[in-house]
Amino acid sequence: MKLALIILAIVLTIIALVLIIGALLPRSHVASRQIILHRSAEEIYQTVRDFSAAPTWRSDLKRVEMIPTTDNHIQFREHGRHGAITYDLVEDQPGVRMVTRIADLNLGYSGTWTFAFTKEATGTRVQITEAGEVSNVLFRFMSRFVFGQSSTIEKYLIALGKKFGEDVSPQP
């Protein structure tokens, strides 16, 4: 009985520490990674912009659903291993820049991804910058100390490289 109480006290202390540390971390963060692909900016942009085809090259997606809107803006829902997330396309400059924003309000996190496509001598620099906000203190702790705030960007860029037959290593 005494051992069980000690174990319970340790577990509760760990949970309390995780929540306290999460609460002390800033809600907002910015993370950015980039790669160079030996393709044109237009070709890469077309691949990234074709949201419904993303499951053919992103293993984290089961399907993407394009959502009809009344005001002609682009909205889509990605269905992955951890559920569904709805996004809005908020800026679209073909071959140059694209911004998507999480449209769901109840996830415990929100933010934008800004895609920049810059022509280089040997191809195109693809940079993704995440401006995120994590309201859930547990998610905040996990994203900072367990997953890493740039891990989703890195996985995305690696998958994009593989789509074009290139082995890439995302850099800050």
Which residues are covered by each model-predicted region?
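Hydrophobic ligand-binding cavity/cleft-lining segments
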Residues: 2-68
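Beta-strand/loop substructures that line and gate deep hydrophobic ligand-binding cavities in soluble
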Residues: 88-90, 101-162, 166, 170-172
